[in-house]
Design a protein with these regions (language model features):
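Helix-loop-strand module that forms the ligand-binding subsite of alpha/beta enzymes
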Residues: 67-146
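N-terminal beta-loop-helix "entrance" segment that forms/cooperates
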Residues: 50-67, 163-166
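A generic structural motif
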Residues: 41-46, 148
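Glycine-rich phosphate/pyrophosphate-binding loop and the adjoining helix
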Residues: 2-10, 150-224
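N-terminal beta1-alpha1 ligand-phosphate binding loop
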Residues: 5-41
Length: 224
């Protein structure tokens, strides 16, 4: 049979990193687990370190005099080289870490905007009973403002010192939920990669399916 010229779809490329500088942080462990599961589900994973994206405090005078720092340029390259991203972020005082917000502020200065149109999944691991959920809600705000399609189902792992004792989630139910959440995110990002129409019509809902009066759909561009 003659070669039809068709080739398998290229693998989904996913950037994964923890918004923590400590190598042994709970969120680094959760990010590493997410990277492993993503690879097991067929993705090509770019596991990065927050230390790769070191930047000074945002300063407009510094930007005007020296340009955007290398750490922010590094995150931009990683975002542009991948189809989607996963961030595992700790919660500091009911919000996201300051170093992550500062990095996002620097990256927001790029045009075209590297966060725009990319799918993102937010995770958190915390020793508290809340699991870092408040920090993830705070993190959604700047990412969505910059055009990220943040996956509706975030994952917060409470009492993570016990739950991640061996680098994996020991509780079977939680482990299954974590893996299912990742698989659903990867499926959506994969569909967006191979079917461009999905990028132009994005429906987001939390908990219940959208209704005609409550859903949010980005307008589809049409040529006249």
């Amino acid at each position: 049979m003659a070669d039809s010229g068709r080739h398998p779809n290229p693998k989904l490329k996913v950037l994964v990193f923890a918004a923590s500088l400590r190598a042994e942080s709970l969120n680094h462990k959760l990010a590493t687990l997410a990277a492993r599961i993503a690879e097991e589900n067929g993705a090509t994973v770019d596991l990065a370190s927050m230390r790769d994206f070191d930047v000074p405090s945002y300063d407009g005078d510094l930007e005007a005099g020296q340009g955007i720092p290398a750490g922010a340029q590094g995150l931009r390259r990683h975002l542009m080289d991948n189809d989607a991203f996963i961030i595992s972020s700790p919660e500091y005082n009911g919000s996201m870490p300051g170093l992550l917000k500062n990095l996002i502020d620097w990256v927001s200065r790029f045009r075209p905007q590297p966060f725009d149109g990319r799918h993102g999944l937010l995770l958190s691991a915390s020793p508290s009973l809340a699991g870092g959920n408040r920090g993830l809600w705070a993190l959604r705000v700047p990412l969505e403002h910059l055009g990220t399609r943040v996956f509706p189902d975030m994952f917060s792992l409470a009492m993570a010192e016990k739950a991640l004792a061996d680098g994996d989630i020991g509780d079977t139910t939680l482990r299954r939920r974590f893996e299912k959440n990742l698989q659903s995110f990867l499926s959506l990002a994969e569909a967006a990669k191979h079917y461009p129409c999905i990028k132009r019509a994005w429906v987001e809902f939390l908990g219940e399916p959208p209704t005609s009066g409550a859903d949010r759909v980005d307008p589809v561009e049409t040529s006249i």
